[in-house]
């Protein structure tokens, strides 16, 4: 049976089951602990800001039953402001096409879909800011790489069915 989870940082609690808008979860950390199944939906409250939070999902929907991350309610899109959190390690195993492209090291992503398939992420605002330094390049070797969304296919072969809309 498909489940819908609600997340509202203002009225929620991570001790709630999150299965109704009246008893939502409070944080994305609680969402990261969920075991999402095909057809499940996670809805973030519009107008909410998830500061220093991130989504790291290792889940698979099905072609006819994707897992969906979206918004509910009225107001502006919910904002995930990772602010350098959401760390994961990348290693492509070899240098890439440009010396400025970091191929090994830690990355911060507001949303990480790791070995995921048939997942839709839509109607969210994603930020992952860093204080800018004049003259500093985006991909300096000593600077943490930050992304809004990262999709990684590593241990399960080619992944498909990833949909990103209105981000």
Segment roles from a protein language model:
Residues 3, 40, 53, 65-67, ...:
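The right-handed parallel beta-helix/beta-solenoid scaffold, focusing on the short coil/turn
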Residues 29-35, 50-61, 79-82:
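Short, T/G/N/S-enriched strand-turn elements that build extracellular solenoid repeat scaffolds
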Residues 60-142:
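Right-handed parallel beta-helix/beta-spiral solenoid domain characteristic of secreted/periplasmic
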Residues 137-154:
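Asp-box/WD-like beta-propeller blade repeats and closely related beta-sheet repeat scaffolds
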Residues 51-53, 106, 119, 128-130, ...:
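Surface-exposed loop/turn segments connecting beta-strands in extracellular beta-rich domains
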